[in-house]
Amino acid sequence: MANSTHTELVQTNGDALWTFLRDKEEWAKLIPGYLSHEVQSADEMMWEFKGNFGVVEKAVKVQVKIKEIIENKKIAFDLEGISDNINGEGYFEMEEVEEGKYNVIGNLNMKAGGFLAAMINPVLEKYVPQTIEQHVQAIAQHISQATV
């Protein structure tokens, strides 16, 4: 399973950061390669994004199911491939470093299944770290600009 965690420091108010992280529609729009999303319920949504998987660039659809919310701390989710046999999980977490400064931590795990797994999993080893790094950077930049 491809796994990566990325952390960015942001200067912001904790309530503003949690409000943003709690609203999955907000951070869905910041996914690298974002194409669209659709909210299906309070705990489920569908993401569609364009991923660069080595020599192939393609649109991928995944079902996102919120599995855990720790208020003012963490939101965790499961991913289930709709268009492809790629599943995983992830989370976003906020950690106060000092007053007005927070680490935004993002984690993503993805694994391909099926007959193409042997080809896709090595590509995910490169894709997952790049994706979570870019996503957390985009979240940090968005939060920083919103609080200026």
Model-flagged regions — what are they?
Residues 1-46:
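Hydrophobic ligand-binding cavity/cleft-lining segments
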Residues 2-7, 44, 61, 74, ...:
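Intrinsic-disorder/low-complexity, polar/charged segments enriched in Ser/Thr/Lys/Arg/Asp/Glu/Gln
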Residues 7-11, 38, 65, 78, ...:
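Generic structural detector for well-ordered beta-strands
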Residues 13, 42, 71, 97-101:
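Short strand-connecting beta-turns/loops that link adjacent beta-strands
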Residues 34-35, 61-68, 88-96:
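Hydrophobic/aromatic beta-strand elements that line small-molecule binding cavities or substrate pockets
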Residues 38-80, 134-142:
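Glycine-rich portal/gate segments that line the openings of hydrophobic small-molecule binding cavities
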Residues 79-130:
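Beta-strand/loop substructures that line and gate deep hydrophobic ligand-binding cavities in soluble
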Residues 124, 128-147:
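Short amphipathic alpha-helical signal-transduction/dimerization elements
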